[in-house]
Amino acid sequence: MSARVARAGWAWRSWGRRAASSLREPPPDAVDVAELLRDSSVAEEGAQEAVARRRPPSQCSVLLFPGQGCQAVGMGSGLLHLPRVRQLYEAAHRVLGYDLLELCLRGPQEDLDRTVHCQPAVFVASLAAVEKLHHLQPAVIDNCVAAAGFSVGEFAALVFAGAMDFSEGLYAVKARAEAMQEASEAVPSGMLSVLGQRQSNFSFACLEAQEHCKSLGIENPVCQVSNYLFPDCRVISGHLEALQFLRRNSAKYHFRRTKMLPVSGGFHTCLMEPAVDPLMKVLGSINIKKPLVAVHSNVSGQKYTHPQHIRKLLGQQVVSPVKWEQTMHSIYERKKGMEFPSTYEVGPGQQLGSILKCCNRQAWKSYSHVDVMQNIMDPDP
């Protein structure tokens, strides 16, 4: 359906301060800091979807929102000419209780890289990039038919699609980040990016890594695929000893390249189980609506269908693999000869574009990145 949906004429309103220390309840007067404008005829979904089906794919757009790991000092600096971007960061300051913009602009990088900081930072920067895109190419927002976000990026995608208000979405991200930071500090764990090949057996490698950990006296060791990126490329999360074992034995498992990721824990595994309840309590206390644009879940790769579906899967996402490769197939799979929509990665980094190229080269040919570093340029007259 069209983003009558999500015209990024985001409506800004003021709201009062709240105690930043409590995660039990949402801001008492948190109004729609970034409510996406809704058309009065939005209830006529069947008619809207029929219109979307008639629109040529080349006139449609897809927005992709990045996740943790793409943060860099200076992000957001190219967007501050836009008044609404400054309002985003001012609102974020109130929700978070600290100056997120200052941290993003000046760092230091090691503070920005902490899970508790980088998840809100990427969330806000990505929605700021949507503002830039709307400023430069408003038709892209109006013609958006689908959105997806990688891990924490899924929250930004849902805010863009009108399923959550900005303030409450950020409040949920804050709770998620703090709970995941605490869980990651309980067990020495991490994430390993693995580029394999056709004969690579990721599951078998993980099982042998678990057995190695047991031989070291580690009880209930964790080692499993946590991100499906593109064919033959996975991220494996778990105990550090398991990941080190895989690196030492990469030739045995036909791994072409391995790299430890700069994250604080074994995300998207059962090691994050302690983070689920705090997040679910917050998700249960905020207003979640049916998305006005199709948003695809990391857990299933399929579209969300209703608010309870969103709550359930956002909680599961913390301890489940990110099925990004499957999501890309779900969005872009089509008959031979059919056109592809334009794709925009909104936020820091271009990792999702690189992954799209490996999943579907034809779809990637219509890919663009909305940078959050460079100074904004007005559209050509």
Swiss-Prot record:
GO MF term list: [acyl-carrier-protein] S-malonyltransferase activity
Knockout or disruption consequences: Conditional deletion in retinal ganglion cells leads to disruption of retinal ganglion cell axons.
Compartment annotation: Mitochondrion
GO BP terms, alphabetized: fatty acid biosynthetic process; mitochondrial small ribosomal subunit assembly
Keywords for this protein: Fatty acid biosynthesis, Fatty acid metabolism, Lipid biosynthesis, Lipid metabolism, Mitochondrion, Transferase, Transit peptide
Tissue: Expressed in retinal ganglion cells.
Superkingdom classification of source: Eukaryota
Entry's EC annotation: 2.3.1.39
Pathway where it operates: Lipid metabolism; fatty acid biosynthesis
Entry function: Catalyzes the transfer of a malonyl moiety from malonyl-CoA to the free thiol group of the phosphopantetheine arm of the mitochondrial ACP protein (NDUFAB1). This suggests the existence of the biosynthesis of fatty acids in mitochondria.
UniProt protein name: Malonyl-CoA-acyl carrier protein transacylase, mitochondrial
Origin organism lineage: Eukaryota, Metazoa, Chordata, Craniata, Vertebrata
